Amino acid sequence: MKLKPIEVAEILQKEIANINCLSELEEVGQVITVGDGIAQIYGLANVKSGEVVEFKSGVKGLVLNLENDSVGAVIMGDDNQVQQGDNVKRTKEVLEVPVGKALLGRVVDALGNPIDGKGDIASKEYRHIEMKAPGIIERTSVSEPVQTGIKAIDSLIPIGRGQRELIIGDRQTGKTAIAVDTIINQKQAHSLTNESDKIYCIYVAIGQKRSSVAQIVKKLEDAGAMDYTLIVSATASEAAALQFIAPYSACSMGEYFRDNGMHALIIYDDLSKHAVAYRQISLLLRRPPGREAYPGDVFYLHSRLLERAAKMSEAKGSGSLTALPIIETQAGDVSAYIPTNVISITDGQIFLESELFYKGVRPAVNVGISVSRVGSAAQIKAMKQVAGSVKLELAQFRELESFSQFGSDLDPATKAQIDHGKRLVEILKQAQYHPFPVEEQIVSIYVGTKKYLNDVPIQKVKEFEDKMLTEIRLNKKDILESIKNEQRITEETEQKLKAFLENFVKKFVK
């Protein structure tokens, strides 16, 4: 059989056309050393800082150090699966996490993978974990309140949407309790249909015990608060790299709400452990240590995170992201490195004192050194009307109280002021997991400031408050409704309230 040259050419052309020549170029390096969650890699010449690399076992790493002859990466997972000599691939991607409403009600790890056993998360959108904070023009001033449901905070240290308010105190003083109460208190707004009233909550557990996180999840489920809450967990047993990236991942999840005209609240519990995780990574990467062995950029670590909380302008959809970072102090030392850093970044702080806590003043807020630098603009008028003088009265009471320890015979005016102060302290006490609606808080504080409690024995103040609120809910609901709707105490409402209280005090004292 004789083949014609033209036929041969046609066959060859067909075969060439069918050849799949889509070859992929991969940049591959090798692990030189591995240990303590850090891998030194040789051969990735074009890798970028912050890029994700993939090890042979499928474990991911995050490049943080670019050196002359090698690259330092933190391993996001089990470093036992990475061995010396393993190949490492560039992915040419930066870290991304799933965002959106599909995450609500779920517990995820620092990379956004579900860890609650409820199946996959059907999220359509992903965001980078490191996003630039909004610029000056894109923001507007804080003007709407975030109601925590805690009398001592909503009246004296008000928090606004888009604010960053630090909760600081020793261990076991009730820092997490304030945060959890604030989440539970948003349930009331979520029962309404108006989207602008709702605040979606994100709780980030950094370096905590797994049992503590499980307890918080259970508490939120029991209170029906998980429907609008997302929990990001990077517990103490997880890699330092995951504890380091958890707040940034959670912040990106919160920014989804902020940038889509909704409102979100994010709680970082706590940034002391976050700084410790970052210090561990930095020292293992052989970066030079500074004060308290923290690296030089530990301020930037927290500032770039907290600057992402903002109240957006109308042109940008008027959304907001409010941040409540938590810092744990050692023996009340607020002047340590990390506490002073975070105090200077935030818009105020709620300082919790162990001494007050042990005295039974709970929440143990030290009103003297707690401030809210921007929140008063967000406080509703009714609260301003009743709470304006409370801070001063409490400060005077503390001063007179310490003074009265030395002098036994006090003049009647001083004694009356001390008694009034003690009753104010009592009225600001509150049980855990029992947030109050703002209109009920206003009535309670009105009772305290207008001296209706003068005839009530101090040990019966809580009983008086409980009975008074029960009575007003049942028989004088119009007073509460008026305060809630008008957002101020009108003359008519005040007359009704005065008449009700005078009557109630007489009955109670009898």
Curated annotation (Swiss-Prot):
Q: Which gene encodes it?
A: atpA
| NCBIfam families, sorted | atpA (TIGR00962), PRK13343.1 (NF009884)
What are the entry keywords? ATP synthesis, ATP-binding, Cell inner membrane, Cell membrane, CF(1), Hydrogen ion transport, Ion transport, Membrane, Nucleotide-binding, Translocase, Transport
Reaction equations catalysed: ATP + H2O + 4 H(+)(in) = ADP + phosphate + 5 H(+)(out)
Q: What does this protein do?
A: Produces ATP from ADP in the presence of a proton gradient across the membrane. The alpha chain is a regulatory subunit.
Specify the protein's topology with respect to the membrane: Peripheral membrane protein
Pfam families, per database record? ATP-synt_ab (PF00006), ATP-synt_ab_C (PF00306), ATP-synt_ab_N (PF02874)
| GO molecular function list | ADP binding; ATP binding; proton-transporting ATP synthase activity, rotational mechanism
Species per Swiss-Prot/TrEMBL record: Rickettsia massiliae (strain Mtu5)
Q: Name it.
A: ATP synthase subunit alpha
Q: TM spans, by residue?
A: none
The record's principal subcellular location, in a coarse class, is membrane
Annotated localization: Cell inner membrane
